[in-house]
Amino acid sequence: MAERENRRGNRRDREETPEFADRLVAINRVSKTVKGGKRFGFAALVVVGDQKGRVGFGKGKAKEVPEAIRKATEQAKRQMIRVPLKEGRTLHHDMYGRHGAGKVVMRTAPEGTGIIAGGPMRAVFEMLGIKDVVSKSVGSQNPYNMIRATIDGLKKEQSPRSVAQRRGKKVADILPKRDEAPAEAEA
């Protein structure tokens, strides 16, 4: 059966490609008080990423757990951001993110360090494709705030190429010289 296109030229009935991995971070039972008592439902927090530099998070509420997870996953796919990765495994520079009372510090790490991060931050780094990072969260331990603070910090990351382009310089002019550092240490 041939695929048909709709009026806007988009493919119809196209299944979502399984290029994204997702991780359920938190699931809570929530209640709404109504005239006759309480109505219970579920809230899900999901992180989605392609493990190649794109990540997003979403939250969904529903009366059943699978429906809440589905809603959260759809929202996460709509809210994805792109983060430049150094050598496809770590961050380009140290950064700081904040949301509410949640503060997060993220530092680059040498190869083989692994992901040193707690709870929700680890899920974000794994879905992003980061293999080496050291991070610390201070303040709020609420998973929503921790993820938002992490995303806030990741949005601030800039690759040396983009910084050089903005300044009108070459990448080599911005990065520290490798040959000069050991020579200065010996003197």
Swiss-Prot record:
SUPFAM superfamilies: dsRNA-binding domain-like, Ribosomal protein S5 domain 2-like. Coiled coil: none annotated. The keyword rRNA-binding applies. InterPro entries: Ribosomal_Su5_D2-typ_SF, Ribosomal_uS5, Ribosomal_uS5_bac-type, Ribosomal_uS5_C, Ribosomal_uS5_N, Ribosomal_uS5_N_CS, Ribsml_uS5_D2-typ_fold_subgr. Residues 155-187 are annotated as: Disordered. GO terms for cellular component: small ribosomal subunit. One of its GO terms (molecular function) is rRNA binding. GO terms for biological process: translation. Residues 170-181 have a biased composition (Basic and acidic residues). The N-terminal domain interacts with the head of the 30S subunit; the C-terminal domain interacts with the body and contacts protein S4. The interaction surface between S4 and S5 is involved in control of translational fidelity. Belongs to the universal ribosomal protein uS5 family. This is Small ribosomal subunit protein uS5. It comes from Ruegeria sp. (strain TM1040).
